């Protein structure tokens, strides 16, 4: 798989990697709740929210793939785009393994 000009191995058909992805998504949800609380606090600084958001994405990628796909990224919009491109690639893989099996394919 290649995302953000980084080539790495990730196969959603691997039970180990699928489990890592699910766990990373769970942890991301927890981090997002904390960020949302910070966003709602009028005393929070924008730089804190941006930093926490970048860290949330960075930790997600490291937990899910063991690779820091953000590298030197310091832009939340760019990080969000990288996240969605990764999910698009995972969806493509998932679609191929969840296709219905048919005996017509072997005959």
Where are each of the predicted segments found?
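Short hydrophobic interaction/assembly module
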Residues: 43-72
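Short N-terminal mixed-charge amphipathic segments
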Residues: 1-46
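Surface-exposed polar/charged interaction patches
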Residues: 27, 31-38, 60-63, 89, ...
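Non-catalytic, well-ordered alpha-helical scaffold segments
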Residues: 22, 51-55, 77-84
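C-terminal charged interaction modules
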Residues: 64-107
